[in-house]
Amino acid sequence: MEKQRNHLQFVRAEKTLLPIEEEFLASVKKKIESQLGSAISKWEKYYTHPIYDCFLMIVNDRPLLTKVNLSPDAPNFWKELCVNNFSFHPKIVCYSDDFDEFQFICFEVPKGIFFSDLSNYPLSRKFNIQKTFLSTLDSMHSFKINENDETIKTVESFLPREAMSIYKTYPVVALFPAVKLAFKKIYTPQINDCGVCHFDLCHQNIIYTGDDIKLINFEYAANANTYLDIWLAKETLNCSDTTFDEVVGYLKKPQVETLYRHKDASLIFNFAYFNSKILSEYITFGLRDPVKLKIWINKSEFFYTKIQNKLFIEKSLDKLIRDFYYLWK
């Protein structure tokens, strides 16, 4: 089903529902109405992600978002969110169980503004939300869902072997084995530095309510190094060095020292993350959003220049990669 559906997305409008989608959504709607005890008065596709579809629905004049999993084998952190009901995530009102044919999660839409509607630079001092943002991260990072450091596992998931299938289109994938090896050499697992990490803190995943911040879309989440989550947020939220220093100024001194000890590892981690975003978007949707791809590819190039000396790259491959990056400037 997934392969058929993703192929058709190249030629259909993003919010178009396929007949097969209408069929499985009927069972999801029925389950939601049963759990909530109320009828759904409105239901429309909100956006499409490589591993799920998101729908906006209205129940008793209350807006809710429902995500339906399209890739059953891909980890998505939904179960962890539902079991723990974290305060930094919007209230979850309904979700599937292990016996349901289709996996879904349904949560309230808090009153507020997405960072994407606020500014390209939402952590700028003028918005006065730096402390609130860091407080939310601190709350999230304080939770451990297991006693494992999943940071290396996360990097490996960012850079799958299957990516070599698009080598001719995206030659950067030839670096992935070397990148994973370089990260293992530079990063030492330490459970004391771990907690729940979002690892996708971009503008579209953060809602500012005026009093606090809610985080959504935890598909990249893991029990991993929290300092790498902070370094990654610097890049995804377009923080200047000055703004970043202001934000981390709310950390305790020992935390700041540990943060900077992980800076070199963060360069490799961030490179892996942005390439993961490129892969999932391009392999699933092709060139549907070249503006988004350009941003991620330019970020990939930035971190490539920072880590290339750790990868021992042949000159011919280096030229091929640089030529590719040049085409996307």
Annotate the PLM regions:
Residues 2-43:
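Juxta-kinase regulatory segment immediately upstream of eukaryotic protein kinase catalytic domains
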Residues 105-113:
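Short pocket-lining segment of the protein kinase catalytic domain that shapes the ATP-binding cleft
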Residues 63-105, 119-139:
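A conserved alpha-helical element in kinase catalytic cores
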Residues 47-58, 183-228:
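Active-site acidic catalytic loop and adjacent metal/ATP-binding pocket
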Residues 227-258, 270-304:
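Active-site activation/catalytic loop segments of kinase-like enzymes and analogous catalytic loops
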Residues 113-127, 146-149:
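Short, polar/flexible loop-turn hinges at active-site or ligand-entry regions and domain interfaces
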Residues 56-57, 66-68, 94, 109, ...:
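Conserved hydrophobic "DFG−1" position in protein kinase catalytic cores
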Residues 23-38, 145-199, 203, 313-328:
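An alpha-helical support segment within catalytic cores of ATP-dependent transferases
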